[in-house]
Amino acid sequence: MKKGFFFDMDGVLFDSLPNHARAWEIVMARHGLHFTKEDCYRQEGCTSRDVILNAYKQQMPDRQVSLEEVEAFYHEKGEKFVELGGAHPMPGAYEVLQAIRSMPDTQIWLVTGSAQLTLLDQLNHAFPGIFVRERMITAFECPHGKPRPEPYLKAWESSGLPKEECCVIENAPLGLQAARAAGLFTVIVNTVPLGYEDFAPWKPDAFLPDMRALLDYLPKLR
């Protein structure tokens, strides 16, 4: 029986990736960098710092980028994301969270590469009564983000549960890679325009089309 549920945020709890992808595309172009929506989907799960540094490393390898520049870049991208409409709760997400909360002795965790200061307020507004700050692993707690296993390892260690009682809910190949490297059971909710072949190297334990399908799948985890 699964008791610890570790949720990614963008593309799982929030239908935010189309606006994230467009914001990255626009702001990268301002800085002379080529970045497509597909690049965003494939790097989803990375910290924004890693996305920015990876783009410079691949396209302008001789360019030295300061931390101050990275912060300004991230702020600029965040403003564009809000301007484009930001994020909305993923259909079916609240029903999944409520169903898990009704199961005995369960823990619900957030594991995200985001570093938004207003994150808890957003979660409480969209999913009241579900998340607490003590069960959130963000870029502040774990700067070495996905695809490294550290974010999910930190959530697992903090939960105090055996690994076999934990379940990761992800939507991104890099998130799946991180979860599998951490040795955790992982369910993919494929809310991005990618195919199973993009996830196959890391062998997800379940591959579902959306959060409503996850709601139907939950009894198998009890």
What are these regions (language model features)?
Residues P104-D105, G183:
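Glycine-centered short loops/turns at secondary-structure junctions
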Residues V12, T112-S114:
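Conserved phosphate-coupling serine/threonine residues in phosphotransfer and NTP-handling enzymes
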Residues Y56-Q98, P104, L161:
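Metal-dependent phosphoesterase signature
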Residues W24, M28, S48-L53, Y74-F81, ...:
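Hydrophobic alpha-helical core bundles mediating ligand binding, dimerization, or RNAP-core interactions
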Residues M1-R42:
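Active-site neighborhood of HAD-like aspartate-dependent phosphohydrolases
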Residues M1-K3, Q98, A115-R222:
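Asp-based, Mg2+/Mn2+-dependent phosphohydrolase catalytic module
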Residues V27-M60, E83:
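Alpha-helical substrate-recognition element adjacent to the catalytic core
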Residues R30-L33, M60-V65, M103-P104, F127-V132, ...:
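Short helix-capping segments at alpha-helix termini
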